């Protein structure tokens, strides 16, 4: 079955432009970029574009995406950016050159798997500096584990240390956080008697320090995805005004109109909960013209944050497979069969690219 809509258009020329802008600015400050493709379900075309624009390494959180990219000819080095489970280690060693790690038991099991496969594997050991996701909270323990890797795990190479910020705890990357990571790296280097190759200062949110010129010297690696793919987190979410060298229109979502009618805006009857167990609040605006699109929460997650590309359209809600749009004020009189376009946020992109029934079209 060939499905035309919903359709996600990917403008590779915009992604290449964003990648060059980000990677060049990082390189000027001595920082290598790992191009992260988890936000697009590891689309090989996007991974290839990042690689061609200077990403020395590619990263994602899911091994299936690495396998798909390798099968499409997008080789390594690959970095696994989600700390792996013990059950995943055979594929980690088989598919990735490097992984993030935060548990001694996993590192010991990784050594055993490397022996079985006759390979070596590089690791970046993670520090938790307050965001409270992965990483060592006790820094003495972290130093001890890094020394253990260096001296007792011959098939596991201690490539460096890293941190994650913002993703869970919303904690901002600051020069002080980066200095704390550099101090941990220095302690480890003193114990092992050599320089660490990688001090990885975080993801897209840490790019703010590159943009502002406040990234401390010594941070030499960032894991960047959203800022290349969409460029919205920092420009829209953080309100950074002078980052307009990054375009935010690389992805366009198109959906088909399947019903247009004038209807009340306030549901009629006794209220319970909606299909997702919630109790929405409705505003009575009288009778208004509404369109239903063949697109739902199963496709993009939160519908209300979709950004219509057309004036006079407002997403007012929906369900798993339906998106309800107020079109009363739309200059174009929408009819059944018409197509509506949206810009996306990162969460929409995560959903849409992982749906097999959304057609993906690449341009430029």
Residue positions per predicted region:
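Generic N-terminal amphipathic, Lys/Arg-enriched alpha-helix
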Residues: 1-10, 14
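Short glycine-enriched loop/turn motifs at secondary-structure junctions
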Residues: 2, 92-94, 317-320
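Alpha-helical packing segments of well-folded alpha/beta enzyme cores
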Residues: 15-18, 22, 184
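N-terminal capping/small domains of soluble enzymes
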Residues: 18-21, 28, 39-52, 334-342, ...
């Amino acid at each position: 079955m060939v499905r035309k809509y919903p359709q996600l258009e990917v403008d590779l020329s915009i992604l290449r432009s964003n990648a060059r802008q980000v990677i060049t600015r990082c390189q000027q400050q001595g920082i290598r970029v790992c191009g992260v493709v988890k936000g697009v379900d590891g689309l090989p075309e996007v991974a290839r574009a990042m690689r061609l624009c200077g990403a020395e390494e590619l990263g994602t959180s899911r091994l299936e995406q690495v396998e798909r990219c390798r099968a499409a000819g997008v080789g390594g080095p690959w970095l696994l950016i989600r700390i792996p489970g013990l059950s995943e280690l055979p594929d980690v060693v088989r598919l990735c050159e490097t992984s993030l790690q935060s548990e001694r038991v996993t590192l010991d099991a990784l050594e055993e798997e490397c022996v079985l496969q006759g390979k070596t594997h590089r690791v970046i050991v993670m520090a938790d500096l307050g965001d409270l996701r992965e990483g060592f909270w006790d820094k003495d323990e972290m130093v001890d584990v890094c020394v253990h890797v260096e001296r007792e795990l011959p098939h596991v190479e201690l490539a460096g240390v890293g941190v994650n910020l913002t993703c869970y705890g919303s904690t901002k990357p600051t020069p002080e956080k980066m200095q704390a990571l550099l101090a941990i790296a220095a302690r480890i280097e003193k114990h092992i008697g050599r320089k660490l190759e990688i001090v990885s200062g975080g993801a897209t949110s840490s790019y703010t320090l590159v943009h502002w010129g406040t990234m401390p010297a010594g941070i030499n690696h960032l894991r960047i995805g959203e800022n290349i793919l969409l460029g919205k987190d920092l420009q829209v979410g953080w309100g950074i005004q002078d980052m307009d060298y990054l375009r935010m229109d690389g992805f366009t979502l198109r959906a088909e109109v399947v019903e247009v009618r004038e209807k009340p805006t306030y549901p009629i009857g006794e209220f319970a909960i909606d299909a997702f167990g919630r109790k929405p609040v409705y505003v009575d605006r009288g009778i208004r013209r509404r369109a239903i699109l063949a697109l739902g929460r199963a496709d993009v997650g939160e519908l209300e944050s979709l950004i219509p590309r057309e004036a006079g359209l407002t997403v007012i809600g929906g369900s798993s497979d339906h998106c309800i749009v107020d079109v009363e004020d739309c200059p174009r009189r929408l009819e059944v069969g018409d197509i509506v376009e949206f810009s996306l946020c990162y969460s929409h992109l995560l959903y849409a690219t992982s749906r097999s029934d959304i057609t993906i079209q690449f341009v430029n």
